[in-house]
């Protein structure tokens, strides 16, 4: 439950013209099913083929209630206005993943790895709206067809890869190439288009084929020290919601919508690494340089037609990150594993300008020094019980048209194995302190905006897993859980980095 006052008037005036008070409440339910089949064919202990098929079905019922009361100060004759909105959204998503991995140590020095990865996902999510324009409690709600939307999203991904590694003396080299074909179709229906197929516009379709080379060079200084020089090309893809052109008015201060023209962003990563190992500890220090093109960022603008604030995503500019990352792993008293990482870097985002809504939207280049840290503690307890705690912190960072404030979060997990580890019960609490929110400040010549975004708040998840056969247990994917760390409707939302 949140209660927010909105003040409307002229800057510098002694009083507001009017004030709207909004109460927002809601409930969210989620059901998820995940199944996975693993098979390994071994030619020898080191020469094998792995085959994995996974299926994930996810449903979420999201009900939001908005109660508004508006008081007019500049005209005492006007009565207080009341309105009630109910907006249910039924999220439906399913996905298949197929993996085939081949590994063959041809000689003691030469190894071949190759494989295929396919992902096939489908989302069909209707959103409805019911309105009572004269009541606080919603006594006489009617269907509000202007805000109906059905979003359909289909994504197919096919990737083939091959890597060759060769070691001679203290030197090692590994080179690889991944070819990726990505296809996405999106459809967004209004109420009229939902009920009359002849009014629907053709699905928005796009596809890409890209090559991603990688090269890793290493030198073993001593048995416990190693130098590495690496290069990889990566991409980050937009997620479905960033491509939905439906204009969402649930926020009283801004109308947000997706951009079907949004394309992936690409990075070239160069790094020099130093690795030091001890019996129970290790330290990895990495200096890196990472230029990125077609950076996906969320931009704000005031419409020249209706004067309202709008928010959407664009491939705005180029960026560069130059920094130092350190990762330490420590095993203490045989029962406690600590993994600590810290990333210190200088971030530069270039300026941009483009035409939208009959006007030129621009942003100046910006830069700052920023850092983030993450610590994970895993504790092994008696009776096949394990406990895990994870803490994350991100400092202030520049974004398009402004900056985002620091943020932090804590997650907890408890795991218990039964029947010789065939049956596993896991309880996880995401965002224990209910602190995982994103605060951002943006401005231009036309506006100044401060925004806070939450993403579900504290959540508890209980899962029961049964393992059979001889395959080693693998971590089950979580529906968009990891990506939420950088989401909150920001330029990082739910995107995929590879």
PLM regions: where:
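Outer membrane beta-barrel strand-and-loop segments of large Gram-negative receptors
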Residues: 95-99, 142-148, 257-259, 263, ...
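Signature of Gram-negative outer-membrane beta-barrel scaffolds
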Residues: 112-224, 354
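Residues on the lipid-exposed face of transmembrane beta-strands in outer-membrane beta-barrel proteins
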Residues: 35-41, 98-104, 160-166, 215-219, ...
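Conserved C-terminal beta-signal and adjacent last beta-strands/turns
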Residues: 215, 366-498
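Transmembrane beta-strands of outer-membrane beta-barrel pores
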Residues: 1, 41, 55-61, 118-122, ...
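Surface-exposed loop/turn segments flanking beta-strands in extracellular/periplasmic regions
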Residues: 4-20, 67-84, 122-150, 187, ...
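Repeated loop/turn-to-beta-strand initiation elements of outer-membrane beta-barrel proteins
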Residues: 46-49, 109-112, 170-173, 224-227, ...
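Surface-exposed extracellular loop regions of Gram-negative outer-membrane beta-barrel proteins
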Residues: 183, 223-269, 289-311, 430-445
